[in-house]
Curated annotation (Swiss-Prot):
Gene name for this UniProt entry: CCDC195
Source species: Homo sapiens
Domain of life where this protein originates: Eukaryota
Protein name, per record: Coiled-coil domain-containing protein 195
Keyword terms of this UniProt record: Coiled coil
Region listing for Disordered, in residue ranges: 28-72, 179-201
Disulfide bonds: none
């Protein structure tokens, strides 16, 4: 019984609060309609003044006004363009691109493309640098194991690297599979350098 009485009191209190809020809401709506009517009245007066000033202007100035109104739409359309760039697999190019991001983004300084390019460059350069470090470690291991076979092979490797051209897209990698691949590269020092160039490219 006491619980029912408490629930009835809570319901009555909530109804009283609802009535208060409804009254406040109606008062605010009345104020809003009054202010919107005042704003519409002042807007009509300013619109009439503009219409009176418009016949005095020449058609050239009217065309200029139309062209300036159409310009932001063109800029918005340019802001939606996606720029795709191709980067070589060398750490020097990546470091220069990260140090000087304005070279690639001077054409669109006001758009939000620069921030996206900076993040893409930083993401692209970090796996490339890791791959270069692993290539250097593997190259030193293979140099110590078989120097005689490598004396004839660098020209062949350089020729192959000059001839082959590929477009690569660097995506976020799964670190577990990446570590497995790197460990398999490190534990196989008997591979030839031309196989290393094929894996790296």
């Amino acid at each position: 019984m006491e619980a029912d009485i408490q629930l009835m009191r809570l319901i009555q209190e909530m109804r009283a609060e609802i009535h208060k809020l409804e009254k406040e809401n109606q008062a605010l709506r009345m104020k809003l309609t009054a202010s919107s009517q005042r704003a519409s009245g002042s807007g009509r007066e300013s619109g009439d003044e503009r219409e009176e000033e418009a016949p005095g202007q020449s058609p050239a100035t009217l065309q200029g006004a139309v062209s300036t109104d159409a310009a932001p739409a063109v800029q918005e359309h340019q802001g939606n363009v996606m720029i795709v760039r191709r980067y070589s697999i060398s750490s020097s190019v990546c470091s220069s691109a990260v140090n000087d991001p304005w070279k690639s983004g001077k054409s669109h300084p006001k758009s939000g493309i620069l921030e996206g390019q900076r993040t893409l460059k930083s993401l692209a350069c970090s796996p490339i640098k890791k791959q270069d470090m692993e290539e250097k470690v593997f190259a030193t291991d293979s140099l110590t194991s078989n120097r005689t076979s490598q004396r004839a092979s660098p020209e062949h490797v350089c020729g192959c690297r000059d001839k082959t051209k590929a477009v690569s897209f660097l995506l976020p990698m799964d670190m577990s599979s990446y570590s497995k691949n790197s460990s398999s590269l490190k534990h196989s020092p008997n591979q030839a350098t031309n196989q290393l160039s094929i894996i790296a490219e």
